[in-house]
């Protein structure tokens, strides 16, 4: 583990405070939807969680097929801005994100182990591009993705504790 990178992205102000992961880069890149982890979701295989998420914005089969072929998460995100967005997207996008992110960690044991290794750290999807819904920008935001990751981690920790009883 690169201690310099850890000190840049995992901060603590005092011994009593929980550590904080403030960026999904370096050793914490695996938390990002841009991380190259194949995921099976809704009967399809996706190269990244980003591609799966962007594809779920639409009910157009051709647009979903196009996104399924995309390996580069930045391209998937860009293409996701061009699809015909389903009417109920705002109501379902959080549940979709949760399902996709859970599938990523359920299906990739080494990633689940890495998530568990964050222990009780606060996970923030810190960004500079202004996403205050899924993350935190300039100290502001709902951090929905970070919250999903912490809830998943807590669920996995609960499973581990049950297995060890």
For every predicted segment, state its role.
Residues 2-165:
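Charged, low-complexity intrinsically disordered segments
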């Amino acid at each position: 583990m690169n201690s310099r990178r850890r000190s840049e992205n995992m901060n603590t102000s005092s011994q009593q405070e929980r550590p904080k992961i403030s960026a999904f880069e370096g050793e914490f890149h695996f938390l990002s939807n841009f991380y190259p982890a194949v995921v099976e979701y809704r009967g399809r295989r996706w190269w990244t969680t980003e591609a799966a998420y962007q594809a779920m914005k639409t009910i157009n089969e051709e647009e979903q097929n196009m996104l399924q072929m995309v390996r580069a998460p930045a391209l998937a995100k860009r293409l996701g801005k061009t699809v015909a967005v389903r009417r109920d997207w705002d109501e379902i996008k959080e549940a979709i994100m949760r399902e996709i992110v859970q599938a990523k960690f359920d299906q990739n044991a080494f990633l689940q182990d890495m998530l568990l290794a964050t222990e009780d750290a606060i996970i923030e999807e810190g960004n500079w591009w202004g996403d205050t819904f899924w993350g935190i920008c300039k100290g502001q935001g709902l951090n929905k993705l970070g919250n999903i990751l912490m809830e998943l981690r807590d669920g996995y920790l609960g499973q581990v504790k049950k297995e060890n009883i």
